[in-house]
Every structure is written in structure tokens, then in C-alpha cells.
């Protein structure tokens, strides 16, 4: 029935307890090294998973075939500048005069799926900024050129012209890179098979090497550096600025709890507020005091984090050694909250076939393992207009049909709601 694919929808009812487990807090720390040169992948259950240099990679491409995200490592000195003087036909005549007035773009710090190259979609429905989706080949074909600055601020700083040629239907990314004068013109393929079970595949253009950055999916948090919009008091503008912060793995959810002492938190109030936010933990737990030249920590700021395994943890920070040591100190506590979890393949349920065949039926596949549960399916178009809805009862392995007859080609959102839990998937009808 599922065509050799497993789709799971598991909802474990929330526990009735309102307080965290009555146990001691566990103190822990991670070491990013002097100068904060390293990043640390961390599991709330098992501690540090792996440590590696922040500067190893320069480009990252999604492992999700229905996504098109390309991220840049800004901390390693990578800058992405949109080329305004032509499309890919201008490759041979690439002209950098006046480039300092061109638009520089950065990764989104909240959405895993928005990198510097696809931060803002283009004017067309299938335009993802760096490329356009081809419904016949199911590829994203690059239609834009970029100026890449590698190693900005270092003696080895270089300028490259860059062309994301295409993302093929297997999820590989083919890119073309050359010096501005056209020399050293090289095409690389970032292969999906090189990063099986990971969020991204990574590449270092300078060294012409594939990079193995991520460990397996057995991590929840990443202690690293990233560029965040930061208010600059000198210019009065908000500018991208490198900060040391904590990113979340895909599937790790969190919510910041302000103004409540950690031992008085009513967990059931916040359980349904956890959300998917790349920097949901982030960097706001610390502030550098310009008077004392020391870091100050928010005593009443605690994070409720739902880990990859579905367990809920409380987390608060107690110290940061800055660039002198790179050590981060924190306390964590596993709660007695039961998990509200969509398990397996990402968040666990899915729509298939996707892309759909226009006029044919698509299906939502679910598998509820904990009794009957009321739910609803809702489908909306790109403008948010409802085109289909159905109330359903989830109970065991099921599939629900959604007719697409009469629907125009486009990108649609299909939402599955049960109680306070709402999850959304995108459906493409070519």
C-alpha cells in the first residue's frame, strides 16, 4: 500500500504532570577551543558526539530532494553576492565593476531550509532564486550567477564567479566555479550519496574537497558560530555579525521560557509551544557587559527542548569563557513529560506521490500506534485558499486520499492537525 515506503504518525499522549522530574540538575560543558575555532555536536542524552573545525566547509547543500537549500559558511569568510548584470548567459562576460554596491545575502538563522542562495524566492512560482524547477525533468536548473568571496578578511582572500548549474532529481548539486578572469574553470558535483543520513552535503571550494562535517543523526544541538542580524550602535543599522550560539538539529524543537524561575516552570504550559527553529536556543542567553568586560547570563531564561528521540529537557546556561577558552557551561534536566512526537522520516508523516500527477489522487500516509485519535487534513494553495479539507480518525496504519482533479499546477500546503499539534507538508502539482 505504501510502495515500499514507511510513513509513521505517532502521537503519544502528553503526561499529566506539570513539573519537571524531581531530580538534580546535571552540570555539563562543551569545549570549542581558544578562539572558538571548533564546533561541537551535542546529544542531550549522551553528551558531546563530535568536535571539528568551524572552517572546514564553505558550501552546504540539502539532502532533502524536495528542497533546494544552499547554505554558505559565513564564519569561514564566505560571502555571497547576487550578480545583477545578467543570467547564466553572462558567464563568459562576468564583470565585477561596481560590485560593492551589489546585494550581499546571508543564511536565514531560523529556517533550516533557507540558505543564502535561496533566501528569497524569485518572482515565479517555481523560481527558488538560484534556480527554477523544471516539472518535466524534476530538476532545479540554475538561472543565476553569483560573486563568491572566499576567506574575506584573510591574506588569502579570493574572488570567484559561481554558477549553481542544477540540482538533479537524485538530489546531487552540480556547481561551476572559476576565477573572475575565467581561468581555473571547474565543475563539481556534490553527491547526495556522500552524506547519507545527514542534513547536508558539504564542500570546500578552496581545497576542492568534499567535507564530512556532520555526525550521524544522533545529536540534538550544535555549539557553533553563525552570522546573526545585530544592531550596530555606531551606524544605527542592523548588520550581520558573527555570534557564538547554539543551533538545533532538524527535528529538535525548543521554546525559550523567560521570567519564570526554572524550578517553578509549569511544563504542560510550554510543551505545545516548542517549535522548529534553527536558533531557537541561539545566543540570547548571554550578553557581554562593556563595563565589567564579562559575560552576563539571564538567570530567569530556561529552554524547554524536545530532543530527536522525543524526550523533553530543560536547559539553562551558567558560563561562557569567550574566545580565551571557548568553553560553554550549562545545566540540563530530563523532564517527565511524555512525548508528542512525529517519528521516523523527519517529522514522520508524508504525502505521496510528490510531485503529484495532475488530475490523479495523492495520499497522506499515517500510522498511529497509541489508540484512536481525531484529526483533520487541510489543503491550501499558494495564496492560502482552502481547496480541500477532511476530518479523519487516526487508528493504526492508514492512508487518506486527496483528489487533485480540477486543481491548477502549483505548490500546495497539506496540513495535518490533531489537537494542538499541527504539521505541514508541501505538495507539488507540475
Language-model regions, residue ranges each:
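Positively charged n-region of N-terminal signal peptides that target proteins for export
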Residues: 1-6, 430
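Short, surface-exposed loop/turn motifs with a glycine/proline- and acidic-biased composition
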Residues: 364, 391-419, 428
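Sec-dependent N-terminal signal peptides
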Residues: 6-15
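Short, glycine-anchored, charge-dense loop/turn motifs used at functional sites
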Residues: 378-387, 412
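Sec/Tat signal peptide C-region and signal peptidase I cleavage site
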Residues: 18-22
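Surface-exposed, beta-sheet-biased, low-hydrophobicity segments with strongly acidic/polar composition
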Residues: 23-336
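Surface-exposed loop/edge segments in extracytoplasmic proteins
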Residues: 184-186, 385-391, 422
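Residue-level detector of functionally pivotal "anchor" positions at catalytic/ligand-binding pockets or at interdomain
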Residues: 331-352, 358-359, 363, 367-369, ...
Amino acid at each position: 500500500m505504501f510502495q515500499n515506503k514507511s510513513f509513521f504518525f505517532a502521537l503519544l499522549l502528553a503526561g499529566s504532570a506539570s513539573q519537571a522530574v524531581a531530580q538534580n540538575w546535571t552540570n555539563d560543558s562543551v569545549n570549542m577551543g581558544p578562539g572558538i575555532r571548533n564546533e561541537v555536536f551535542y546529544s542531550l542524552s549522551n553528551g558531546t558526539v563530535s568536535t571539528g573545525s568551524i572552517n572546514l566547509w564553505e558550501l552546504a547543500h540539502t539532502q532533502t530532494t524536495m528542497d533546494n537549500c544552499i547554505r554558505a559558511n559565513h564564519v569561514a569568510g564566505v560571502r555571497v553576492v547576487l550578480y545583477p548584470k545578467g543570467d547564466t548567459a553572462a558567464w563568459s562576460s562576468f564583470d565585477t565593476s561596481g560590485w560593492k554596491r551589489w546585494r550581499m545575502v546571508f543564511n536565514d538563522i531560523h529556517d533550516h531550509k533557507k540558505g543564502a542562495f535561496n533566501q528569497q524566492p524569485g518572482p515565479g512560482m517555481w523560481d527558488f532564486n538560484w534556480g527554477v524547477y523544471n516539472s518535466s525533468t524534476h530538476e532545479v536548473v540554475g538561472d543565476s550567477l553569483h560573486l563568491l568571496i572566499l576567506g574575506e578578511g584573510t591574506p588569502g582572500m579570493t574572488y570567484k564567479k559561481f554558477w549553481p548549474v542544477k540540482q538533479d532529481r537524485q538530489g546531487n548539486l552540480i556547481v561551476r566555479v572559476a576565477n573572475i578572469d575565467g581561468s581555473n574553470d571547474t565543475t563539481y558535483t556534490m553527491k547526495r550519496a556522500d552524506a547519507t543520513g545527514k542534513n547536508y552535503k558539504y564542500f570546500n571550494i578552496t581545497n576542492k574537497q568534499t567535507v564530512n562535517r556532520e555526525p550521524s543523526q544522533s545529536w540534538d544541538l550544535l555549539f557553533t558560530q553563525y552570522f546573526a542580524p545585530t544592531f550596530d550602535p555606531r551606524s544605527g543599522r542592523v548588520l550581520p555579525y558573527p555570534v557564538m550560539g547554539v543551533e538545533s538539529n532538524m527535528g529538535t524543537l525548543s521554546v525559550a521560557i523567560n521570567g519564570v524561575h526554572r524550578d517553578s516552570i509549569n511544563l504542560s504550559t510550554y510543551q505545545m509551544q516548542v517549535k522548529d527553529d534553527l536558533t531557537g536556543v541561539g545566543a540570547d542567553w548571554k550578553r557581554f557587559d562593556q563595563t565589567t568586560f564579562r559575560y552576563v547570563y539571564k538567570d530567569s531564561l530556561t529552554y524547554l527542548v524536545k530532543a530527536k528521540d522525543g524526550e523533553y529537557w530543560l536547559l539553562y546556561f551558567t558560563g561562557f569563557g569567550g574566545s580565551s577558552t571557548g568553553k560553554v557551561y550549562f545545566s540540563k534536566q530530563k523532564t517527565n513529560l511524555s512525548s508528542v512526537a512525529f517519528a521516523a522520516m523527519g517529522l514522520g508523516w508524508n504525502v505521496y506521490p510528490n510531485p503529484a500527477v495532475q488530475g490523479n489522487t495523492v495520499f497522506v500516509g499515517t500510522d498511529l500506534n497509541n489508540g484512536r485519535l481525531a484529526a483533520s487534513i487541510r489543503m491550501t494553495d499558494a495564496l492560502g485558499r482552502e481547496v480541500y479539507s477532511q476530518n479523519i480518525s487516526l487508528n493504526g496504519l492508514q492512508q487518506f486520499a486527496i483528489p487533485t482533479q480540477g486543481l491548477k499546477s502549483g505548490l500546495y500546503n497539506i496540513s495535518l492537525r490533531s489537537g494542538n499539534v499541527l504539521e505541514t507538508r508541501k505538495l507539488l502539482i507540475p
